[in-house]
Amino acid sequence: MTVRIALDAMGGDNAPRAVIEGMLEVQKKRPEVVFTLVGIESRIRQELEQMGVEEDGFRIWHASEVVEMDEKPAVALRTKKDSSMRVGANLVKENQVDAFVSAGNTGALMATAKFVLKTLRGIDRPAIASVIPAVGGETLMLDLGANVDCSSEHLCQFALMGSIFANAVLGVRAPRVGLLNIGEEDTKGNEQVRDAGEQLKARSATLIPGGSYVGNVEGTDIFKDTVDVVVCDGFVGNVSLKSIEGTAKMLTHYLRGAFTKNWKTKLMYLIARPALRCFRDEMDPRKHNGAILLGLNGVVVKSHGGADSVAYAHAIHVAVDLAEKQVTKRIRDAVAKFRAEGTQPSDPAV
């Protein structure tokens, strides 16, 4: 199956070099993927020439403007209609590509994607979702910052989209969905979370197709083999994600310090090096790069702004997976099914 992926060649701290290198890395493993580099053509060609790369297996699509990393989303949306970000989203809308990847300004990407592609019918707001490494596998977490305030209906919609993603992309046959809360008891949390819990419990068969609602989960459960999808609002999700990233960096720092204290610890490092390399690879944030904007009429993946070629390549692989497994269509079909039955994810529980 040929998959067409558009890349924002201007987005991110290391663009366009990291974008091109990431693309070339994916081409080695997936030669059937066809790429479109979107951005200022002269800058892209100059970079390709410096790298000694010939135009093969990809095309260049000129976009005359660039959204800066510190630019306000509303300003970018209003004034930069020919930005690489806007053009990339339009290519998805016009079905010229199957997915779009950008390491650019997160707020501007969300605003642009929502404006151009619109949300799926029956989904009020898109959510940022990402896969977190966990014991025995992986956990999908959403929302990670798109929506600071969420109603119970929004949380239920996130649960629906998350369960479909877990099944289609992560291969979880019966996704277990939990609401991130300050305790496991049904009485814990704010009103929105409590109401969402009641709806998910009453309608898990329709809101979590083929899966189950396991109730409230705490922060420690994210890494356990007890839940496959963790649902929360964007404020809680973003704080949790940054805490996870900070903890991983702290562990790496402590381990490095412990093994470089003296000649004895350095000798111990030589013995433990194979195991430590496995640990490092598992915890490497570059290999978990690629957040998904779920709920749009098209596939959009957000790469970390500081991504290098390894991290960017992983974000591309995420986009290819989403396109191949038709996650957008699956979510659309699930919501359509609810509407045909006279209900939808935003309806109150009955």
Curated annotation (Swiss-Prot):
It is an enzyme of class 2 (transferase). It catalyses: a fatty acyl-[ACP] + phosphate = an acyl phosphate + holo-[ACP]. Belongs to the PlsX family. It is found in: Cytoplasm. Pathway: Lipid metabolism; phospholipid metabolism. One of its GO terms (biological process) is fatty acid biosynthetic process. It comes from the Bacteria. One of its GO terms (molecular function) is phosphate:acyl-[acyl carrier protein] acyltransferase activity. This is Phosphate acyltransferase. Pfam families: FA_synthesis. Homodimer. Probably interacts with PlsY. Catalyzes the reversible formation of acyl-phosphate (acyl-PO(4)) from acyl-[acyl-carrier-protein] (acyl-ACP). This enzyme utilizes acyl-ACP as fatty acyl donor, but not acyl-CoA. Keywords: Cytoplasm, Lipid biosynthesis, Lipid metabolism, Phospholipid biosynthesis, Phospholipid metabolism, Transferase. It comes from Magnetococcus marinus (strain ATCC BAA-1437 / JCM 17883 / MC-1). InterPro entries: FA_synthesis, Phospholipid_synth_PlsX-like. Its EC number is 2.3.1.274. GO terms for cellular component: cytoplasm.
